[in-house]
Amino acid sequence: MAQNVNNIKDHVDLFHQPEYQELFENKKQFEGMPTAEKVQEVAEWTKSWEYREKNFAREALTVNPAKACQPLGALLAAIGFEGTLPFVHGSQGCVAYFRTHLTRHFKEPVSAVSSSMTENAAVFGGLKNMVDGLQNSYALYKPKMIAVCTTCMAEVIGDDLGAFLGNARQDGVIPDDLPVPFAHTPSFVGSHITGYDSMMKSILSTLTEGKKKETTNGKINFIAGFETYIGNVRAIKNIISAFDLEGTLLSDTEMYLDSPNLGEFKMYHEGTSLEDAADSINAEATVTLQTYTTPKTREYIEKKWGQKTYTYRPWGVKGTDEFLMGLSELTGKPIPKEFEIARGRAVDAMTDTQAWVHGKRAAVYGDPDLVMGLLQFMLEMGIEPVHVLVNNSTKEFEEEAKALLAASPYGQQATVWGGKDLWHMRSLLFTEPVDFLVGNSYAKYLQRDTKTPLIRIGYPIFDRHHLHRYSTIGYEGAINLLNWIANGLMDELDRKTDTPSVTDISFDLVR
């Protein structure tokens, strides 16, 4: 018997027991699986240039996408505001996916509700589901704001959110003064960063509805973007504090996604107050830290509010320098001394380690802004990006990435692959191998197949704990990036040199 009360096996050992091995073998026979030799033959063929050409010729199929659905980003934008309950107009299964996708990365509960659309609603429309859902949500959870987004089902049948919300208010199921921003977030176009942008724009337009810029409040607005490193949220707030600024971080997710365990459950955490968000229309300017996550929001702020927006990417030393100098120029305040010290530490760390990473060939994938930040840092360290892949790419991103790479001697061998997926990346790694790969947890399958060392940076990271608590921006973030990359390469070097009397001549204690 595989399991007994005196010897409980976990899943790592359990499925290697004879009973399960026999079950798996019977399953293969039942399904008529090809022989192991045939499987190996085809697997070897998929590593070839011939297969790569066929792989890159496909048009109507995505295999292992490096992006997520729009509502996921909408949820992340919404939970950063005080007392806000995300409401997804669609099926329960979709909402469960979004919640677990965030929870598995942050290791924190993420609250969201659904209108629970089923087959009937798909045929006759989801009005009743939304009205009932809003009534129950407000009665049970007492939110200060309900942020509504949609799934594919609601979008395919063309449900009119504005009209539905009007009916709900007319029926008296939610108060007239309850803010209910809504965003259409169809997952068959765009990605999670599109959903973030749509929801952020909707929240700001709803909270400032009917207002006009009257006078400056002396504040600076900050938008982090689709930010999955809570250390970065803290870094932004630390910069605001160090400059002694009156600043408003629009969608402050720090306490929601990294809350202390004090023995009492809180459904809502601090976040950006609705009053501060409503007053953001009167700020001096808005600073965004991601270009391709907030295009509609920035356009809205510039055109509707008549407010200037500035975009910075504080990755690596140069990017952080530009951000701090830009902030100093914008506010008229000097750069605090503490950042000079932090910069010196980053430069010192980079000097200590550059010999171990200089000239290393890398592959990288992720969201456009994440990849641009990583490229900035890699080029500073003399790392040579070879494969740059962004599934949710844009023409503007590709032009910017190519210009950045062309301007550096270390970017001359790089190719930017826009709109490609992780099965494309697999072909690239087999046909043009690199020294390491930077990506999220889904890259572990690429690591297993191609034996390319993986440095986990991005979202989601499901199979390692607490990386989201670190920063990737600022001078401290540069040290973290250097730490992960350099030590990952050294771990791989140890693995390659650990055979006594064969490879261990380079199994060094000091590196």
From Swiss-Prot:
Q: Does the keyword Nucleotide-binding apply?
A: yes
Which keywords does UniProt give here? ATP-binding, Iron, Iron-sulfur, Metal-binding, Nitrogen fixation, Nucleotide-binding, Oxidoreductase
Q: EC number(s) for this protein?
A: 1.18.6.1
* Protein residues bound to [8Fe-7S] cluster: 69, 94, 152, 187
Cofactor field: [8Fe-7S] cluster
What is the superkingdom listed in this entry's lineage? Answer: Bacteria
Query: What biological process terms from GO does the record include?
Result: nitrogen fixation
Name the catalysed reactions.
N2 + 8 reduced [2Fe-2S]-[ferredoxin] + 16 ATP + 16 H2O = H2 + 8 oxidized [2Fe-2S]-[ferredoxin] + 2 NH4(+) + 16 ADP + 16 phosphate + 6 H(+)
Q: One GO molecular-function annotation for this sequence?
A: metal ion binding
The record's remark on the cofactor is: Binds 1 [8Fe-7S] cluster per heterodimer.
A Gene Ontology cellular-component term: molybdenum-iron nitrogenase complex
Pfam family for this entry, one: Oxidored_nitro
* InterPro entries attached to this UniProt entry: ChlB/BchB/BchZ, Nase/OxRdtase_comp1, Nase_comp1_CS, Nase_Mo-Fe_CF_bsu, Nase_Mo-Fe_CF_bsu_N
User: In UniProt terms, what function does this protein have?
Assistant: This molybdenum-iron protein is part of the nitrogenase complex that catalyzes the key enzymatic reactions in nitrogen fixation.
Similarity remark = Belongs to the NifD/NifK/NifE/NifN family.
Question: Can you state the subunit structure given in the record?
Answer: Tetramer of two alpha and two beta chains. Forms complex with the iron protein (nitrogenase component 2).
**By what name is this protein known?**
Nitrogenase molybdenum-iron protein beta chain
Q: Which organism is it from?
A: Crocosphaera subtropica (strain ATCC 51142 / BH68) (Cyanothece sp. (strain ATCC 51142))
In the UniProt record, what gene is named as encoding this protein? Answer: nifK
